[in-house]
Design a protein with these regions (language model features):
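An acidic/histidine-cluster motif and surrounding catalytic segment
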Residues: 1-96, 101-304
Length: 304
């Protein structure tokens, strides 16, 4: 049995259409059950939300389409937590996407193979095939003590570890002196992100999920090439019209799933992730992207 796909959508009809079109091109799409959780409208977003719901009501080519239209706006975090929890009450595994993601034709094959191969491997609790552009060679698949929320999968056996109380997780991370490791060895301020969630400066489900698994020494299976691209940084609605802090190249070749032994973290992958995040969010790189986008806007004005 194939893993059900769970898609979270809100107010971006064109992103939603692109996500579904790319997903539909996968050879396993017609054999897969799709759950769509459509969040309710905030004031002023009614028209866009209605447009999204018209898109998902079209005749898509999946085995079965289950649509949950929220009557109120839950917000992404609450929608993801409730949606994943409900699907895992009747299935033992799940593949999760958000509306700004587009996937390779080999995405579903890879995710289903990994979810089957590692279904009884307790140390592995999270799966992704998204990878940022990076320097340095990585194997096709590897294990790392981290999480990636852009096109991921998990099992009901792992989701039971989810701790929604970020304060409890932060307290334990600090008590054990693990802030540096939690920050990907200084690569990104994930500890501060967790603090911000606690103080309601963000409402991230991801940071709480990452903390939940990190504190239990659980691993993610990741890939050296990306079968997922995040199209949500387009700004104006045209993906190629802006420079991005984080870039990824969508691979159009399959990734073989070979069981990794021994089951332990790949330290090279950890180093590459840390270095990539440190560079992408450095002031130097941010300035470069800012200037690049400024020039793009000036050039576009001149063309008009």
């Amino acid at each position: 049995e194939l893993a059900p796909i769970v898609l979270f959508v809100y107010n971006r009809p064109e992103h939603t259409r692109a996500c579904l079109e790319y997903l539909e091109r996968n050879e396993l799409a017609a054999e897969s059950e799709l759950y769509v959780f459509a969040d309710g409208a905030k004031s002023g977003s009614e028209e866009a939300v209605a447009a999204v719901r018209r898109v998902i009501a079209e005749p898509w080519k999946f085995k079965r389409l289950n649509v949950v239209e929220r009557p109120e706006n839950k917000g992404l975090a609450a929608n993801v937590i409730a949606g994943v929890t409900s699907v895992l009450e009747t299935h033992d595994r799940v593949i999760v996407l958000e509306d700004d993601l587009i996937v390779s034709p080999y995405f579903l094959r890879f995710m289903n193979e990994v979810l089957e191969v590692y279904k009884d491997t307790e140390e592995v609790c999270h799966v992704t095939c998204h990878m940022l552009d990076h320097k340095g060679e990585l194997p096709d698949t590897f294990l790392i003590r981290w999480c990636n929320s852009w096109g991921w999968g998990t099992w009901s056996r792992a989701w039971q570890y989810f701790e929604p109380d970020g304060r409890k997780s932060l307290r334990e991370i600090e008590r054990r002196g693990l802030c540096w490791e939690f920050d990907l060895d200084g690569g990104f301020h994930f500890t501060q992100m967790l603090r911000d969630q606690i103080e309601s400066r963000n409402n991230s489900w991801f940071i709480r999920w990452y903390a939940s698994l990190f504190l239990r020494d659980k691993l993610m299976l990741g890939t050296g090439r990306s079968l997922v691209d995040n199209a949500g940084f387009d700004g104006s609605g045209t993906h190629c019209n802006t420079m991005q802090l984080c870039t990824q190249t969508l691979s159009m070749n399959p990734i073989a799933v070979v069981p990794i032994s021994p089951v332990k973290e790949n330290l090279l992958a950890r180093k590459v992730y840390s270095r990539t995040y440190r560079y992408n969010y450095s002031y130097r790189h941010k300035l470069k992207v800012f200037i690049g986008n400024l020039w793009i806007r000036v050039f576009n004005r001149k063309k008009r």
